[in-house]
Amino acid sequence: VESTIIDLTCTPPRLLRPGGITLEQLREVLGEVAVDPAVTRLMGEGEKPRAPGMKYRHYAPKAPVTVVQGAPAAAARYIQDHMAPGDGVICFDEYAGLFDGHPLEQLGPSTDVPEQARRVFDALRWFDGTDVQQIWAQCPEAAGIGLAVANRLNKAAGFHIVQAE
């Protein structure tokens, strides 16, 4: 996950792109920090991007991506229940065995978000060498460095996000 981008020209400062420096770390130093709406949703028609990578499906593979949020076990079950033969999966390491026979990239252990940050781009790009029609992705909680990982997955998915129950 590349750099954190923050706008210091406004009050309070505004997080434009989460990265290696977490929102929590920024708040320890700066106090109040707002999160730009483009971090958590698609930009609307006519909205101007305030930082690189805000507007478009940055780093998106050719196949459409669906991000499944929620507890890791629930997200894995949701993917199992909804995926079609030949769909690809980006999952936490401990759930890889549930998707035998499907093209798969492991994101890292569900508890190791820094490792997920190191793997997320390679996991997304790997699928461009396959013929999958759909990619399903587990997603870490959007806290700490997980906010950056979730942001990159959600952007790659064009914010096509479902919540596992």
For every predicted segment, state its role:
Residues 1-165:
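Active-site-adjacent structural elements in enzyme catalytic cores
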